[in-house]
Amino acid sequence: MSEENYMRIIDLRGRKLTRAEMLDAMPRAEMGTNEATELVQPILDDVKARGAAALRDFAEKFDHIRPENLRVPVEVMKAAVDELDPEVRAAIEESVRRSRAVSASQVPAPFHTDLAEGARVSERWIPVQRVGLYVPGGKAVYPSSVIMNVVPAQAAGVESLAIATPPSRNNADGLPDKTILATCSILGVDEVYAVGGAQAVAMFAYGAKGSEPQDGEILCDPVDKITGPGNIFVATAKRMVSGIVGIDAVAGPTEIAIIADGGANPSWLAADLIGQAEHDELAGSVLITDSEDIAAKVQEDLKYRVPRTEHAERVETSLRGRQSGIILTDGIEQSIDAANAYAAEHLEIQTADPDAVIAKIRNAGAIFRGPYSPVPLGDYMSGSNHVLPTSGTARFASGLGVHTFMKPVEVIEYDEQGLKTLAARVNAFAVSEDLPAHGESVLSRFIDDPYNKETIKEQEEQAGLR
């Protein structure tokens, strides 16, 4: 490990930046999306054409194991619950309880607006019928992501839930991690596939025919929407099938930003930056502060902590990467401007007056208020959702929630008098757009000959439309 500082300094002090310059100053990872697209397209095509046979081939190629059962038997998931460590099970069940409480409060209520006598517009929220939930594997296993995907979908009333998660080389039969399977069973999800990567996205988007007797004729039916985080290949595949199915977001590497003033605890700040860097070499860890003293103390604390953490090499790579850094500002207002430009997936506020800062934050996936609301709390057990927008997309997107799994549908309900009041104006609007048949559709309900343009106004007057 080097004695050099782990994080580069981005000094904004004394600089009056335009919006474009501020966005450009933010630390970001470089993503090879073009290369990923070239690799993903053949995977999508092959799964669409060959179904389960292609899924097994890709498992062997990428996961180095060929699962006998692509769909996990229900009895295996039930057995995984019985084998679960009691403390882990208690933690999972507490996380589920808190997530369900928050999700229940998010269910939108229908409403209606009466615009006039006989003129009503109402809105219904309808759950998506079938959803495919992706739970990543790789450097870690994420039973927490099962909870974050499944609980809001269930609260929304989704009828059919399917989960895909990579097969595990730690299991001789190629089944996924047992903690993930146990979590699925605890949540009552019995359609789980040992399929990872872009091929899982293809399976959800197109469905997959069986190739072995245990698959049945159809291994997996296509879904209406795909949610859940994943690596660049999963994210690219989701982007490429978007429009065929709905998606929640195209996720990039995970990230944290912390706004801290001179009163923050530098050891806690360092620990929180390391906690995010632990995810991935491309994870972004960003400290935004107007205190040069805090910045220096965090750098020193990192020198102590990084070599002692379990995944020190991964953490060091992340902290030294171009996607991480310490942003020095002139004051709290510039810190807020930088945070809004960065639009972090996770934004911690560790300042003397966190509420004043939060009031000015426009762009963040989730905000963690104060020193006792660290990001790992949200990762596992705060009740909030940890599937959040990354790579600056929090400027226009939000995290996963009940709304992700529902569609607002407007119901237009006018009676004869309600339509009659507007008929002439609808016709005038339609004619102005050179779409006269639109107006004729409405007028046909009240006059005999809407096609006679010479007498149209006279007919409207006789019908009481004017």
State what each model feature region is.
Residues 2-129:
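N-terminal Rossmann-like NAD(P)+-binding subdomain of aldehyde/semialdehyde dehydrogenases
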Residues 6-14, 191-196, 326-331:
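Short acidic-hydrophobic, aromatic-tinged amphipathic segments that line or gate anion-handling sites
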Residues 113-182:
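Conserved small-residue-rich beta-alpha loop and adjacent elements
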Residues 159-169, 285-292, 298:
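Short internal beta-strands
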Residues 189-284:
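Conserved NAD(P)+-binding/catalytic subdomain of aldehyde/semialdehyde dehydrogenases
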Residues 279, 287-364:
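A glycine- and small/hydrophobic-rich beta-loop-beta segment
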Residues 341-465:
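C-terminal core of ALDH-fold dehydrogenases
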